[in-house]
Every structure is written in structure tokens, then in C-alpha cells.
Amino acid sequence: MLFRSRVAVFAREWRRQQLESTHGASKHTYIPLQFSPGEAFQFDWSEDWAVIADERVKLQVAHCKLSYSHAFFVRAYPLQTHEMLFDAHYHAFTAWGGIPQRGIYDNMKTAVDKVKRGKQRDVNARFAAMVSHYLFDAEFCNPAAGWEKGQIEKNVQDARRRLWQKVPEMPSLTALNDWLAARCVALWHESTHPTEARTIQAALDDERPFLMPTGQPFDGFVAQTKRISPTSLLTFERTRY
């Protein structure tokens, strides 16, 4: 009886350890995503700093990355507004030479008005208009699921090392963005693709035939009727003009 009791205790402990091991693996292990040429790009924002016209300025930085070739594009703005979001997409598409079939995003306020159950979203009307203009599909990650767009999450960290630590003082934001665009293209030629024995530029050359034409930039303006005050002032976004 004592022998059987010890065997039962051992069996229970072994099963417990196996369950903990299995649950731990399922909780922290993720299957890498594979992408076809022209299938997808990923987008995200970050905050970084640069010296512009002798002043250290905090910038909102748009990051775009093709999921197949890993060609990345970075552009800086003063704010994360719709107009700047639209501008970032157009410049990235132009640099890549076309548009993939879908874009992968988190639930940023300029794209999603309300996060619902599962993958259901109330998509912002202006963002939806941009997506319709460029003819790609928008896909949104689950909340707090950064691994679903892991490439662009990594690109934010890589950009700080490859770009922002080396950026010289600039006379203007336009000059900074010109420098960033040129540096991104140079890095495509210099950097090896993470899973293939070739450069990012070589992978992009193979991907470009699968991209849709960019066409005309999306005109994202919104017309609003405003009341002029007796002193000839109007209020827009809590600022008087």
C-alpha cells in the first residue's frame, strides 16, 4: 500500500509539472507569421527627438514596413493627426513603388472610433476613406497584442539605433524628412534580409511587381462651416484664428 501511495503521489506531481510546462509554452510561444510578396505592410507611431533650427524638438514618427521584403520607411511629424497619417502612407507607398493588399494596425484613435468584440471595429470615417482610395484592406490587432505586428514593433527599436542616434542637426522638418527618406533607402541596400541571404533592396525588387500602383495622393481634407465672431475670429480645434 505504501508503494502504491508513493506511485500515486509521483504520478500526480508529474502530471502537474507537465500541465504547467504546457500552459507556460502556450502562454509565451507564438508562431512566426509568413507573408507573400505584396501581401501586407505594418504601421505604427513612436515618439523621438531631433534638433531642428537649434531647438530640441519632440516628434511623432510614422513607421511603415513591408512584411515580405522588410523595406521600412520612417517620416516625422509634429502631431499624430489624420492629415499626417495620410501623408505618411503616401510617402511610404511612393518610396516602395506601390501598395500591398492589406495594412496591419493597432487600434490608434485616428483609425478606430471604437473597439468591439473580437476583430470587430467601428472604423473612423476619414481613415476608411483613405483605405478605400488606395484599395487596400485594413486589419486591426487585438488589444495589447503587439506580437501581431511584431515587425513594426521591432522597427521602432531598430530606428532609434540606425537613424535617431545618428541624425544631424537639421534646419527644418522638411530637411529632416528628406534625410530620413534617403537614409531608409540606403539602409535597404546595406541591410541583409532577416530570413534570406540577400539585401532588403533585393527582396523589395522581387516584391514590387506584386504591389498595386500608388496613383494620386488621398485628399483627406474636411470642409467645416464655422461661425465668425463680431471681432472677425473663428475657432478651430480650440484655437482662435
Regions found by a protein language model. Name each.
Residues 105-106, 117-118, 136-160, 176, ...:
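RNase H-like two-metal-ion nuclease catalytic core shared by retroviral integrases
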Residues 99-119:
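Acidic/histidine-rich, metal-coordinating catalytic segments
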Residues 119-138:
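Two-metal-ion acidic nuclease core segments, chiefly of the RNase H-like superfamily
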Residues 74-102:
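Active-site beta-loop-alpha junctions of metal-dependent nucleic acid enzymes
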Residues 156-241:
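Active-site-proximal acidic segments at structured loop/helix or strand boundaries
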Residues 44, 70, 103-106, 131, ...:
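Short, conserved catalytic/metal-binding motifs centered on acidic residues
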Residues 5, 9, 13-72, 81-84, ...:
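Mobile-element integrase/transposase regions
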